[in-house]
């Protein structure tokens, strides 16, 4: 993404990578739940999908968002907040597992969570792409006037 000089285009490319990550994680989990995908490959694809979501989001997304809209801000702060939300989710799952007597199969819990979060993630990412494209077009019109 360093090769893309236009910050808005780079922001959209980051969205595409995030979208692909959600799709890979969700589709591979669906195939696993239908017993069409071996558990080993399911873990590989879910890991790849989550990696494709996490890396652009935490290393490129905020930096290019700030640059694309000429905002004053610090990408490090946004990355810290996003990581904190992720850690809260991880800790919540661990506390629920250890603190409550939940009778749950963790493979089922994980696969359902991946399916739900992938589905939600695709729609949120598509909406974000729409929103930022609309905002970018409005800022171009405002600067042209």
Where do the model's predicted regions map?
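Structural signal for the C-terminal ends of transmembrane alpha-helices
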Residues: 1-6, 130
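C-terminal transmembrane helical hairpin of 12-TM major facilitator-type secondary transporters
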Residues: 6-55
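Extracellular/periplasmic helix-loop-helix junctions in multi-pass membrane proteins
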Residues: 31-40, 95-112
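Alpha-helical transmembrane segments of polytopic membrane proteins
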Residues: 44-50, 107-122
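Intracellular juxtamembrane helix-capping segments at the cytosolic ends
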Residues: 52-70
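A late C-terminal transmembrane helix in Major Facilitator Superfamily
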Residues: 68-101
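Multi-pass alpha-helical transporter architecture, strongest
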Residues: 102, 115-145
